[in-house]
Amino acid sequence: KTFGQPPYKFLTNMRLDFAERLLVETDYTFSEVAFLSGFSSQSHLTSTLSRLRGMTPAKVRKSK
């Protein structure tokens, strides 16, 4: 808890940060972004991003 949160939450947030960066800075598909950022599937990325950040991958990408 060095970062004030359990390790799994810290890692999830790091993966989401990386996924958001890929969505904004690349033209990778949502499935590719999910795989590259450590999510098991596109739907896992979408549900986690929606639950924790309140945005879908498409909305993140449109915010370029």
Regions found by a protein language model. Name each.
Residues 43:
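Key DNA-contact positions within bacterial/archaeal DNA-binding proteins
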Residues 47-64:
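…primarily DNA-binding HTH/wHTH and HhH modules…
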